[in-house]
């Protein structure tokens, strides 16, 4: 029984994760022009946390290391509005055109959701139309509040109408509330707690104004594992009848509004956080998000690998969370990866019976690390002979010969090879010529 459990772990850890293009819906493009604009207004510490450095080469390197095919770019905080609507609109136009250029320069690697010069609603509508219709933005990014103007505010109705008419994706992101004690920010950065409250506040304000029911073609993404919504929603629903009776609110269909939301798993996507999130949404509305570059790339790669390994135990399909749900949300904007010829081989391994459990542990670990950290390792799929459990077959798919050579030189592969040297009775490697790789990959999706 123990051997079967270890084998199940091995199968899960070595399952194919590279056959489908993974999508990161939560990342930020911190362009030089953005930093210059923010610094010119003395706002680089406006959110109580330093704005990290960013460049496209490092972003792509992180994506390759993490196995991410496509990232959705958005503007970070703070919102580029400092009292002059025309200035803000001009900068948002410049920023959106820069993001559109990145999308064009690296086809398939980047999408972008446009920045809008809120709280100037008229100019925001104009920029939304230009970004979506001319630049072919993949959606818009809206701050939870723009200097006190919260999502759900009736002032935003003209913008919601325009976005709804274009079936727009809205990426929401927390920003500093207008009335915040500066001393409090200095001691405990907003991102550690207030961002979660801020997101919850904004989404519940949208629900209270029935925005998502009245504009059913909007697709709104909530960041950071739903923030405090799983905890706040039961209280909100419980108080709603009283609020309606007292005339503070109008009747709204809370569940219908919440059902239209999508949720990214950026931040601390612990098992408990994901389980809590699933009390208010469904598996097909969960999306992967990194929050790059606000977290160091090595930490993000490790966290993504951990999440990917834990999803099945939570009853979730890694392919759906990391790829399919985002592909459905953004439609044709997310490219289908094209595959040429790959290096494909089959390993036939006979393991010493009394060392089978130890071998499977080694194999599980090398599979987990390889799939999480090596973009050139497309698939490591293990199988056990039904009649002889000591016979293990591993289907290996590599991007090319170079990827295979790089794989066998890694520290984790060497640990596996040296640690199992006395566990293997025989090893046979069969190199193959893939005849229908493209068709296989399409079917595997």
Predicted regions and their residues:
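Bacterial N-terminal signal peptides
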Residues: 8-18
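Active-site gating/metal-coordination segments in enzymes
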Residues: 69, 75-203
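Aromatic-lined glycan-binding groove of carbohydrate-active enzymes
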Residues: 207-210, 216-256
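Short S/T/G/P-rich N-terminal loop/turn motif that feeds into the first structured element of a domain
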Residues: 335-392, 397-414, 425-445
């Amino acid at each position: 029984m123990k051997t079967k459990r270890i084998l199940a772990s091995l199968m899960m850890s070595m399952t194919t994760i590279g056959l489908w293009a993974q999508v990161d819906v939560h990342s930020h493009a911190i362009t030089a022009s953005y930093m210059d604009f923010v610094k010119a207004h003395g706002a680089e510490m406006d959110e109580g946390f330093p704005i990290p450095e960013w460049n496209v080469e490092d972003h792509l390197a992180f994506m390759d290391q993490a196995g991410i095919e496509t990232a959705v770019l958005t503007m970070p905080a703070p919102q580029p509005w400092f009292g002059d609507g025309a200035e803000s609109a001009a900068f948002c136009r410049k920023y959106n055109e820069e993001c559109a250029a990145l999308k064009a320069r690296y086809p398939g690697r980047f999408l972008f959701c446009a920045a809008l010069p809120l709280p100037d609603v008229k100019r925001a509508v104009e920029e939304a139309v230009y970004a979506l219709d001319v630049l072919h933005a993949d959606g818009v990014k809206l701050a939870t509040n723009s200097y006190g103007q919260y999502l759900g505010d009736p002032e935003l109705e003209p913008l919601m109408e325009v976005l709804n008419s274009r079936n727009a994706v809205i990426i929401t992101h927390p920003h500093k509330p207008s009335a915040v004690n500066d001393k409090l920010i200095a001691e405990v950065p907003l991102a550690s707690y207030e961002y979660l409250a801020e997101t919850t506040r904004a989404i519940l304000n949208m629900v209270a104004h029935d925005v998502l029911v009245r504009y059913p073609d909007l697709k709104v993404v909530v960041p950071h594992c739903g923030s405090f919504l799983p905890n706040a929603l039961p209280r909100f629903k419980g108080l709603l009848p009283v609020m309606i009776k007292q005339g503070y609110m109008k009747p709204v269909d809370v569940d219908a509004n919440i059902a239209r939301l999508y949720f990214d798993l950026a931040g601390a996507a612990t098992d408990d956080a994901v389980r809590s999130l699933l009390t208010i949404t469904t598996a097909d509305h969960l999306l992967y998000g990194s929050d790059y570059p606000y977290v160091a790339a090595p930490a993000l790669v490790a966290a993504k690998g951990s999440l990917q390994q834990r999803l099945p135990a939570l009853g979730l399909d890694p392919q759906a969370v990391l790829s399919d749900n985002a592909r459905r949300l953004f439609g044709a904007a997310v490219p289908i990866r094209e595959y040429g010829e790959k290096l494909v081989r089959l390993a036939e391994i006979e393991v010493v019976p009394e060392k089978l459990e130890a071998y499977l542990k080694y194999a599980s670990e090398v599979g987990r690390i390889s799939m999480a950290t090596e973009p050139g390792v497309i698939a490591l799929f293990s199988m056990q002979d039904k009649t002889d459990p000591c016979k293990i077959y591993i289907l290996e798919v590599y991007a090319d010969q170079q990827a295979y050579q790089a794989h066998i030189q890694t520290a984790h592969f060497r640990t596996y090879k040296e640690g199992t040297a006395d566990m293997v009775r025989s090893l046979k490697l069969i190199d193959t010529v893939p005849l229908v790789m493209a068709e296989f990959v399409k079917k595997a999706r």
